[in-house]
Amino acid sequence: VTQDYSQPIISDELGSNSPHAAAERNCFARGVHTPALFEIDGNPIPALVADFGSPLFVFSEHTLRSKARHAREAFRRRYPKTSFAWSFKTNHLQSVCQILRQEGWIAEVVSDFEYEKARYLGFAGPDIVFNGPYKPRAILRRAIDEGALLHIDNWDELSLIEELTRDRREPLDVGIRVWLDAGIRPVWSKFGFALANGEAERAAERIVKNPRLRLHTLHTHIGTYILEPSAYRTATQKLLALRDTIQRKHGHLLDCLDLGGGFPSNSLLHGMAGPAEQVVPPIEAYADAITDVLNRLPEKKRPLLRLETGRHLVDEAGYLLTSVVAVKGIHRQRAENDGLSARDFKEQLIAGEDS
């Protein structure tokens, strides 16, 4: 008798399926000592709080640009045909988006608000990747008219796009979102057409046969804060296999593979089983996993690789400045701050005595 195998995960006694849950009681999970910080990009922290109050979010332009350039170099040195899209859902602050636009990123959006924000900030329609499980008719019509790249998520959306493009003279470039198992648990199941049951191939066939649409991209998004680079290798292999099937059956070679995001940062997550510097692989490990597969292809068959980076770029650039408003002696000395509603932040002594 056989049964489907499901990879085990660490779980606590309450039955949580979070891989980080058991780390709550791990003596290494509380992070490591960090020195006092007195300024951010040359701006004294007391002056920032005096000018803007607290709690206050501050982002380092220097760190953001450095992370972007490091990621770009890691991938393009291995695979020059790499394009990057900034995940607006991760952070849609105007300055953050503009900095990444200056660094050569296009926009990746998942809602009408994000699409309109990207256009307002100067991203042209063809420089916008439109993901998301739901795209209202009005914004879909606008995105089609402006030439955005639509990643189709479901059959209903495909039918709506077919309706909206019925009178087009030139085919519209589109992509399909592919749900696949890359070997990590839990498996995300909220995006796209399933690969294993042939749904993704059927969606591709329907698009290829429509003269008003042109299948440009295969897209997948396997999760967030992925600590196993090998999962991206598996995802790349599976998308390439689907691409080969489409070419073999329909004579159409797709231009682009979009591996989505999910790349972790070195910011410490609540309950992480060890310091981030020891747990999180370098971005080069993810670049190796993906590009090793692509570089095995004949040069003429190598697709454009697109990545939708988010937290990997911005996490370490962001700071939440708070002020101590009370000190209590309950059980042990505790300090309360004015950012009590904030969670999953690494506490750090700011503009005070090192301890």
Can you say where each PLM-predicted feature lies in the sequence?
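Non-cysteine beta-strand/loop elements that form the S-adenosyl-L-methionine
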Residues: 110-113, 131-135, 171-182, 213-220, ...
